[in-house]
Amino acid sequence: MAKLGVRSLKEMVGRTDLLVATDAVDEPHKGKVDLSAILNNPYAKAGSEVTFDPKAEYNFQLEKTLDEKVLVKKCSRAIHGGEKTRFSVEVKNTDRAFGTILGAEITRNNKNGLPEDTVEIDCTGAGGQSFGAFIPKGLTLKLTGDCNDYFGKGLSGGKLILKTPENAGYKAEDNIIVGNVALYGATSGTAFINGMAGERFAVRNSGANAVVEGVGEHGCESVSYTHL
């Protein structure tokens, strides 16, 4: 470490500029792999910080999410006065944790949630990771399309409906419509999935109920107090 010019293991983290590709390799592809893009680190050479600083300010750009731009604003009367609200929105697979910020606002202002289906949001498209994660009672998300991993993670009283498009051209019951680890750690609420789910469906579910038309490996492990 002293020869490398570092005083601790922490100082070595991220210092790929200290690594050199060895020539002591006896195999036919020797010299055919260019590692310069991996090993070159101009920041380290310039003396800049190359490791993550946990004290650095987080900036997740939440103001750019659909929750902040659309959902919370449209649901203001429901959040603060319990007014029934329903509208449609198009989602894409980069819209992660769709509905989670809205759910947090509902819970912040209504500790026991809202009456069932107070807020109904009809979505179309491809849901991103953690679609409907942690949503509370009173919030219903309906998605016509498909969804990525962690659908309904930590579901906390809300309702999720995932439907195969009518013009899909395939049988819903024979095709995966939602990714892995759907409903992981859910504690209450319901989910209806018009198709199959991927691996580890509803693992550690302890109270949420769900209907699905098939699951992959390791589905329903460590579940309790639930109907699946």
Regions found by a protein language model. Give the residues of each.
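Conserved small/polar residues in nucleotide/adenosyl-binding loops
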Residues: 226-227
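Conserved structured catalytic cores and adjacent interaction surfaces
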Residues: 181, 186, 191-192, 205, ...
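Terminal amphipathic helices with adjacent charged low-complexity linkers/tails
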Residues: 9-61
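Acidic/polar low-complexity surface segments
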Residues: 158-182, 206-208
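Phosphate/diphosphate-binding loops
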Residues: 1-10
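Short, T/G/N/S-enriched strand-turn elements that build extracellular solenoid repeat scaffolds
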Residues: 110-112, 129-135, 147-155, 180-183, ...
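The right-handed parallel beta-helix/beta-solenoid scaffold, focusing on the short coil/turn
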Residues: 117-119, 137-139, 151, 158, ...
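Feature marks extracellular polysaccharide-active and adherence modules
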Residues: 105, 124, 134, 142-146, ...
